Amino acid sequence: MEDKNILYGPEPFHPLADGTAGEQMFYALSRYADISGCIALTNAHTKENVLYEEFLKLSCRLAESFKKYGLKQNDTIAVCSENGLQFFLPLIASLYLGIIAAPVSDKYIERELIHSLGIVKPRIIFCSKNTFQKVLNVKSKLKYVETIIILDLNEDLGGYQCLNNFISQNSDINLDVKKFKPNSFNRDDQVALVMFSSGTTGVSKGVMLTHKNIVARFSHCKDPTFGNAINPTTAILTVIPFHHGFGMTTTLGYFTCGFRVALMHTFEEKLFLQSLQDYKVESTLLVPTLMAFFPKSALVEKYDLSHLKEIASGGAPLSKEIGEMVKKRFKLNFVRQGYGLTETTSAVLITPDTDVRPGSTGKIVPFHAVKVVDPTTGKILGPNETGELYFKGDMIMKSYYNNEEATKAIINKDGWLRSGDIAYYDNDGHFYIVDRLKSLIKYKGYQVAPAEIEGILLQHPYIVDAGVTGIPDEAAGELPAAGVVVQTGKYLNEQIVQNFVSSQVSTAKWLRGGVKFLDEIPKGSTGKIDRKVLRQMFEKHKSKL
């Protein structure tokens, strides 16, 4: 008998469609290619556009080029590039053929690249002109890499082909896309992508996502409750890195809906707001650290953002306070939150637009189940009891690439995946993230969630960004400490900040480890606070027990 405290997703608005992720992508692109002038991608920095018609033809020609080059099903390619118009072409061509694609961060240093590429051993690395030199340096140390292809140049560089020349040399410019046919294979087993975990709890691991995992995400994207109503030409603006799971699977889903994806490779406040206005953007993707910026920005009122209907937040927990401030500033009905891991393909908890609860990260999505488990006893907990989240369903990864030990540590024999995150759900099944299990600060036996204190700090009118960590202390175990960024022209001191927090929380959450005033909070490439680096800034602290 199933435990009554296991929660299941609702019936899907769209059942899982037949076919592989490549077949579904091909048929979707074909449909939108027939709409005259339908734009697939816009580079917000350069204003360049790519039409769905062109996007489809290039992806098919690249797939044919892969075949002529000699790539076969289960061979691997890698992509190391910032967000760009060409980023998804090798990925979609790979989906067509059953080739495995491995996106890696353009921010990786050579040591990190060597580690990640060494897991999947790609035959080809696609890069940008910005990452070319770094990738070239790495290639000399990786004998399995046969060649490098530069995505965003129109001419070859250093003896290596640009994407346009590779396609021209290996495929017919007059290719009839209506005669192109993606390969068919077992979507349940065939790996589509290897995404790399963030490595915040150790070295990064290769997360194997199957075609079925991706197809389930496509279904959610078309769901009007958990995703979007299908409306070609709807404009989306994203600054989320495409190599990140949130940016990757969400954007792939957008293509199946025929949306116009306006991309940014770096966040620039004025350009972001200008793009929202110019492209009449209806939905945008942000991480919470960027969300915190807008409630206090003087620029927001200078732009016409009347088309904006939704801001979607993911990648890290969003505090209730910031969510409410952003909603009010942009005059939105709600801010859509999502919660997921690289290992769950995409968000498995999403705010349903029919039932919004401030501070909640959402409800369990179709095709999935969730339970909250006591980390100590293993007991399945009920409503309003805090424990670790476990998930099961169609978007759970196949395994870690060539790492059976790590796979067994995160997925149990019954197929439940441990999230490593602490949360609870209310009586109506809305979930609330407390913090990472490993991020919790242990103060005199009490567990303190950094995200809670960060949410309070960001309520202060002079604080534009904040990060909280625990620093070692012999007497207490760990002391909560905060780094804060103060608004230009405003003044705060340590005592003011400590008093502001202590007036709103229990004594275990006081900032006894101190406060540091920083120019910026240390963060990773996806905007998550790097608590390890932040902790190092507090090595010389004074206990204030």
Curated annotation (Swiss-Prot):
Protein name: Luciferin 4-monooxygenase
Compartment(s) of residence: Peroxisome
Protein source organism: Photuris pensylvanica
Record keyword Transcription present: no
Family: Belongs to the ATP-dependent AMP-binding enzyme family.
Enzyme class: oxidoreductase
GO CC aspect terms: peroxisome
Catalytic activity: firefly D-luciferin + ATP + O2 = firefly oxyluciferin + hnu + AMP + CO2 + diphosphate
A molecular function (GO) term: CoA-ligase activity
EC numbers, comma separated: 1.13.12.7
Top-level taxonomic group: Eukaryota
Keywords on record: ATP-binding, Luminescence, Magnesium, Metal-binding, Monooxygenase, Nucleotide-binding, Oxidoreductase, Peroxisome, Photoprotein
Motif Microbody targeting signal positions after renumbering to this chain: 543-545
Cofactor: Mg(2+)
Keyword Metal-binding: yes
InterPro entries xref list: AMP-bd_C, AMP-bd_C_sf, AMP-binding_CS, AMP-dep_synth/lig_dom
Phylogenetic placement of the source organism: Eukaryota, Metazoa, Ecdysozoa, Arthropoda, Hexapoda
